[in-house]
Amino acid sequence: MATLLHIDSAVFPQGSASREVTSTFVKTWLEEHPEGKVVYRDLAANPLPHLDFAAVSAGAQNTLRAELADELAAADAVLIGAPMYNFTIPSTLKAWLDQVIIVGHNAGSPDGPVASIPFTVVASRGGSYAPGTPRADFEFVQNYMEKVLGGMFGASVDFIVPELTLAPSKPEMAELVPLAEASRSKAFEDAVQKAKDLAARLAA
C-alpha cells in the first residue's frame, strides 16, 4: 500500500487554484490506486511554528521535527500546493520546510532517505512568470522549491503551474482570460495525467 503525503498551504479554503488542482490529483491517484493511503496536512488551517533556537539545536531529537521527518520518510510520494504570495511560497510552507529539513538526518546528502521520493508541486500564481515574460525574474516558487527539495533532499521535483489565476477577477487583466482558462485546463489535465503516472509507477 503506497502512501501519498499531501500538503496544502493556500490561505483560502475555497476558490484556491492550488487546492483545486491538488484535490484533482488526489482524487485521480486514489481512483488509480484504491488501496493507497493519503496523509494530509493543511498548513493554513494548522500552521506549524517557525524554527527557534531550541528546535534547531535539538535537530531530530525535537519531537515535532522528528514527527514531520518520519511522516515524510514514510511517504512514497509527496504532493505540495504552493501558491505564489509576494513572489514566493507561503510562510506556512516555508515553516514546514524549515522544520522537516534536518541536515545530517534526512538532508544534506544526494542519496539520503528522501532522495527516492518523487515530489509534485502545484505552483499556482495570479500572473505569469514564465520564461520570456516581463516578470520572469520575479519567479521564486519553482526556482526555490526545485533548489530546496533537490538540493537538500536530492529528490526529483515535478511541477504543475496554473497561471494568471487572477485574470477572471481583475478587469485590467480581461484580455488575459483566454490564456488563464487555457492554463487552468492544462493544470487539471496535468494533475490527472501525473497522478495516473505516479500511481502506475508506485504499483510497478
Regions found by a protein language model. Give the residues of each.
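A contiguous catalytic/ligand-binding core that recognizes phosphate-bearing ligands
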Residues: 104-108
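Active-site donor-binding loop signature of nucleotide-sugar glycosyltransferases
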Residues: 43, 124, 162-164
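Short, glycine-/small-residue-rich phosphate/pyrophosphate-handling segment
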Residues: 109-154
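N-terminal beta1-alpha1-beta2 submodule of the flavodoxin-like/Rossmannoid cofactor-binding fold
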Residues: 1-82, 87-102, 178, 188-204
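Glycine-rich phosphate/pyrophosphate-binding loop and the adjoining helix
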Residues: 135-139, 144-204
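Structural beta-sheet core signal
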Residues: 6, 80, 119-123, 159
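A short, flexible beta-alpha/helix-coil linker loop
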Residues: 10-12, 126-129, 165-167
